[in-house]
């Protein structure tokens, strides 16, 4: 059944909530920030751990976040997942502290933006598919008189790759991982509602794949969105809240209500 999954987004060493489409590689470009926490990353790690919110992730959005990420991970070793700048060279290091590592941009060529399968194969060999999460954060691409499609975006969601989300893509990638994180970059941080069409498609594309986990993020604005995702995905997809959540300065969703949902659904 659908459950609430927590996140800790780090930017310049602080816990923040950011509008996804405003992140860039340039420090000169202004990032639209919904929330900057006065509390350390370890506070949120402890909060999730004490309330048994499992499968939570720490995402390093750009440089200067390693120390903050380690602080969160060390608060409850092997409890949190970690993503952001993960490569073949450092994945072993992060797995000393994290339950799983999360990868996106590393899997694509930096110049052509093409998916490089051999990198995923090597990561799976080193980490094991049960400790590897593939981040398929995406943007909607719509053309006149055509059905919308969702294409994986890299480089802080600014660059479209050649990898389209569909049944074939998931069937292929499931050879190397058993979990996916999907940010709907177009609605991330806006608190205007989830991409219902994407959630429904995620279920459709993976309905015949056993034991695969998907966490959806982007736009959630009400605790009722847990019920909506459960309906759209037949309970197969989990949901994370960001800017709408009270622990991140939001006024739309109470953390305790999300925890209660989990306890009632998974008692």
UniProtKB/Swiss-Prot annotation:
The keyword Nucleotide-binding belongs to this UniProt entry's keyword annotation: no
Main subcellular localisation: cytoplasm
GO MF, one annotated term: 1-(5-phosphoribosyl)-5-[(5-phosphoribosylamino)methylideneamino]imidazole-4-carboxamide isomerase activity
Reaction(s) catalysed by this chain's protein: 1-(5-phospho-beta-D-ribosyl)-5-[(5-phospho-beta-D-ribosylamino)methylideneamino]imidazole-4-carboxamide = 5-[(5-phospho-1-deoxy-D-ribulos-1-ylimino)methylamino]-1-(5-phospho-beta-D-ribosyl)imidazole-4-carboxamide
Domain of life: Eukaryota
One Pfam family, short name: His_biosynth
A GO cellular component annotation in the UniProt record: cytoplasm
EC class: isomerase
GO BP field: L-histidine biosynthetic process; L-tryptophan biosynthetic process
Keywords: Amino-acid biosynthesis, Cytoplasm, Histidine biosynthesis, Isomerase
UniProt family annotation: Belongs to the HisA/HisF family.
Stated name of the protein: 1-(5-phosphoribosyl)-5-[(5-phosphoribosylamino)methylideneamino] imidazole-4-carboxamide isomerase
Gene assigned in the entry: HIS6
């Amino acid at each position: 059944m659908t459950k609430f999954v927590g996140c800790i987004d780090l930017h310049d060493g602080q816990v923040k909530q950011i509008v996804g489409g405003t992140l860039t590689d340039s420090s000169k470009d202004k990032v639209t920030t919904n929330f900057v926490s006065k509390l350390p990353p370890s506070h949120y790690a402890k909060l999730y751990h004490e309330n048994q919110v499992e499968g939570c992730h720490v995402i390093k959005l750009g440089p200067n976040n390693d120390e903050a990420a380690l602080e969160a991970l060390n608060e409850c070793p092997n409890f949190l997942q970690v993503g952001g700048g993960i490569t073949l060279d450092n994945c072993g290091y992060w797995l000393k502290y994290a339950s799983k590592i999360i990868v996106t941009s590393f899997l694509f060529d930096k110049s052509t933006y093409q998916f490089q399968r051999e990198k995923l194969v090597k990561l799976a060999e080193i980490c094991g598919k049960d400790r590897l999460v593939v981040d398929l954060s995406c943007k909607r691409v719509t053309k006149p008189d055509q059905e919308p499609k969702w294409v994986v975006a890299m480089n802080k969601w600014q660059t479209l790759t050649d990898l389209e989300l569909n049944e074939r893509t998931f069937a292929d990638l499931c050879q190397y991982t058993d979990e996916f994180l999907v940010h709907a970059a177009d609605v991330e941080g806006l608190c205007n509602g989830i991409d219902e069409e994407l959630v429904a498609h995620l279920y459709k594309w993976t309905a015949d794949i056993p034991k695969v986990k998907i966490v959806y993020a982007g736009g959630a604005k009400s605790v009722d969105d847990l019920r909506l995702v459960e309906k759209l995905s037949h309970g197969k997809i989990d949901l994370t809240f960001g800017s709408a959540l009270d622990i991140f300065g939001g006024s739309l969703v109470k953390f305790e209500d999300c925890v209660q949902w989990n306890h009632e659904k998974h008692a």
